[in-house]
Amino acid sequence: MMNILLINGPNLNLLGTREPEIYGNKTLSDIEKDLTKVAKEKSINLECFQSNHEGEIVDKIQESVKSIQGILINAGAFTHTSISIRDALIGSKIPFVELHISNIFSREDFRKESFLTDKAIGIISGFGISSYSLALEGIIGYLSIKD
């Protein structure tokens, strides 16, 4: 069975209440339940992890090296600031898809720079919560071809 890790960064625990005009009304728990169901239907084990703390995300990536085949990451604000998450992803050698609910390239200038994009196998951005299912499809397709 393929194991995929979903990582959500800071403030994504506030989905459903934080700026619903940008991020929608679904909670992170709703998104995780829906995505886990889709993964299970495809015989994929999806592990979900969220943290507001950069070091915890780095630790989770490092702990996953032997058990996870692919990572989906919505690093939130850490997308634009975290060299340590970038380095952990590179060091893990686990293929990853960067995802964002909003189109980060059509927002404030500081959100247009990602420290992850050039190392990701792909990026999904701007499709609302559908970005999660699109990213899952992308990583499954990539890993299926890779094997």
UniProtKB/Swiss-Prot annotation:
Pathway: Metabolic intermediate biosynthesis; chorismate biosynthesis; chorismate from D-erythrose 4-phosphate and phosphoenolpyruvate: step 3/7. The active site is at Y23, H100. It comes from Prochlorococcus marinus (strain MIT 9301). One of its GO terms (biological process) is chorismate biosynthetic process. Belongs to the type-II 3-dehydroquinase family. SUPFAM superfamilies: Type II 3-dehydroquinate dehydratase. Its EC number is 4.2.1.10. The keyword Cytoplasm does not apply. This is 3-dehydroquinate dehydratase. CDD domains: DHQase_II (cd00466). InterPro entries: DHquinase_II, DHquinase_II_CS, DHquinase_II_sf. Keywords: Amino-acid biosynthesis, Aromatic amino acid biosynthesis, Lyase. Coiled coil: none annotated. Pfam families: DHquinase_II (PF01220). Catalyzes a trans-dehydration via an enolate intermediate. It catalyses: 3-dehydroquinate = 3-dehydroshikimate + H2O. It comes from the Bacteria. The record marks R18 as: Transition state stabilizer. Substrate binds at N74, H80, D87, I101, S102, R111.
